[in-house]
Amino acid sequence: MTTPTLDLAIITGLSGAGRSTAAKCLEDLGWFVVDNLPPELLSTMAELGRRSGGAISRIAVVVDVRGRPFFSDLRAAIAALDARGMHPRMLFLEASDDALIRRFEHVRRPHPLQRDERVVDGIGRERILLAELRGEADLVLDTTDLNVHELRSKIDAAFGQPNANRLNATVVSFGYKYGLPLDADLVADCRFLPNPHWVEALRPFTGRDPQVRDYVLAQPGAQDFLDQYSALLRLVGEGYAREGKRYLTLAVGCTGGKHRSVAIAEQLGIRLAAGGVGVRVVHRDLGRE
């Protein structure tokens, strides 16, 4: 049996340069992130990933190597991984002295290496300690002029997978008489459309059945609603993507959650999928009556 491929990343760099933010970005991309792992445990962590049967395929480790022993341990750990055919990528984060000073002043915390001196002294000391490690990094990111979203974009480009940035939407149909979905980001009300419940021939069927679907979609305003709401969702989706939000729950409601909301939710799912959105359609209250 083929052993699943394991992707390893090491996140390190200057204090205040964005290691924690980078770790959160990788976590959002589906990486298994371990913070402040001693370098000598890297091989153990990698072995756990290999034995997971593919459940853990990407591991990112945040390593603090300000001390010389830790630096030596990290180099030895990387060499051991290389010898076993596992080649971790190293991301090194840095920023200008001015940017780092502003960040430490903003959080009102001392630099870990400043001792009884100024923040800038601690930064300088750390630069010297990590200079050799910086030269061995696969990717060096200067975060001086980057906001969180720009840093996320760069990490996405370097460590993401195809479709990693794709918006994923769950479209939930529901009945108002059973209450709103608590996790909904956006709610659409389909009760402006005539209710098939009052058409005796349609009452036993649901919005997934062709006769009900065709009836709902043929009503005045149904197609206009789908066109305009889909356009709105594209606009909102682009904004969410820029903000790093990749999961969206869209609720579509009617009185009982059987006819109109089901038909409209199905159509919204089709339109969103055609626009490149990952879609899952759920009919919360179907069969509840």
From Swiss-Prot:
InterPro entries from the xrefs?
Answer: P-loop_NTPase, RapZ-like, RapZ-like_N, RapZ_C
Regarding protein family, the annotation reads: Belongs to the RapZ-like family.
Keywords from UniProt, A to Z, are:
ATP-binding, GTP-binding, Nucleotide-binding
Q: Can you name one GO molecular function term for this protein?
A: ATP binding
Give the binding site residues for ATP: G13, L14, S15, G16, A17, G18, R19, S20
The name under which this protein is listed is Nucleotide-binding protein Francci3_1634
PANTHER family assigned: RNASE ADAPTER PROTEIN RAPZ (PTHR30448:SF0)
| Primary role | Displays ATPase and GTPase activities.
Give the top-rank taxon of the lineage listed in the UniProt record for this protein: Bacteria
Any Pfam family from its record, for instance, is RapZ-like_N
- Binding site residues for GTP: D64, V65, R66, G67
